[in-house]
Amino acid sequence: MEDKQKIISKDYIQKALDERIERIKKYDTRYLQMIKEEALLIDTEGFVVGQVNGLTVIKIGDYSFGKPARITASTYMGKEGIINIEREIEMSGPSHSKGVLILTGYLGEQFAQDMPLSLTANLCFEQLYGGVDGDSASSTEAYAMLSSLSGIPINQSIAVTGSINQKGYIQPIGGVNEKIEGFYQTCKLRGFNGDQGVIIPVQNVRNLHLSDEIIDAVRKNKFHVYAVSTIDEGIEILTGVPAGKKDRNGKFPLGTINYLAHEKLKKFSGITNK
């Protein structure tokens, strides 16, 4: 029977808003279904070299939701520097392109004080068929690069968000709650293993407003939220290997991530610049 009530109450308005959200949420559900069917390739366990789970936010009107995105890096001898594949095919916005250029500055200051930075590296948002903008994935791209250069694999149970500056410090980003929720739902779909979680900028801790379900999972150590302030802190969480800090002679400790990356770049430079 049709409701002929003339006065629109608060309950009617709330019902209409809730139904609108449910209609829009079908896109969120569809992404999870694609991950379940492996139409979207996302790992939530295991270790892989040069591959990191990034976190993105999709907006539809005034509704937004987060989803993970696979980001990969391949590094090899050459002089082309860092190639942003999205930029090459005109799918990268200015903020994302700026983030990649900042990453070049970080690598140069960190590893090229005693030699030219001689490498070619490809960075890619896998299975991206629309545009990408924003610099919130620049830390994720840095971790993928360090993993590729050092040969040390990244823990796929962890997803990452955060931008970086040329000094290697992590900077705050937007949409932190949606991003955490997106990866949490993906891990829930696949099954929790006790290691899964996200790395966020320490500045975004004040912005956290997570669901009771996620808070409960964190309390039970089913899911983790790590807050970091530097690339070195993040890479240690992702690999379990010390990052390594330079001594007074500019040398990294043997066996650390930065030592291995520097040695690879030194090899590239020696061969490329003969």
Regions found by a protein language model. Name each.
Residues M1-I8, I21-I24:
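AAA+ ATPase "lid" subdomain C-terminal helix
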Residues I7-D11, K15:
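Terminal amphipathic helices with adjacent charged low-complexity linkers/tails
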Residues K10, R30-N53, V57, K67-M91, ...:
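Peripheral, non-AAA+ core regions of ATP-driven protein-machinery
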Residues A16-R20, L238:
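A general structural motif at alpha-helix termini
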Residues K59-Y63:
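SsDNA-processing nucleotidyl-transfer enzymes
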